[in-house]
């Protein structure tokens, strides 16, 4: 699953590829200090957006 986040500190969007929302949250907080979950996207949408993926 591709979980889309927005980080308020850096002002960037990113995808976290994880099996669950809890896992995605842990990964997002590892890389960013203020991530906010936005939505879940399929692989095609995530690829089209071109955001970094963690």
Residue ranges and their predicted role:
Residues 1-12:
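Short aromatic-glycine-(Arg/Gly/Cys) micro-motifs in beta-strand/loop hairpins
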Residues 12-16, 45-48:
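Short, surface-exposed beta-strand/loop "edge" segments at domain boundaries and coil↔beta transitions
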Residues 16-34:
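Short, flexible N-terminal segments of the mature chain
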Residues 29-54:
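Short, mixed-charge low-complexity intrinsically disordered segments
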């Amino acid at each position: 699953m591709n979980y889309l986040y927005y980080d308020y500190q850096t002002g960037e969007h990113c995808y976290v590829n994880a099996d669950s929302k809890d896992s995605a949250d842990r990964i997002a907080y590892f890389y960013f200090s203020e991530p906010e979950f936005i939505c879940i996207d399929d692989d095609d949408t995530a690829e089209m957006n071109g955001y970094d993926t963690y």
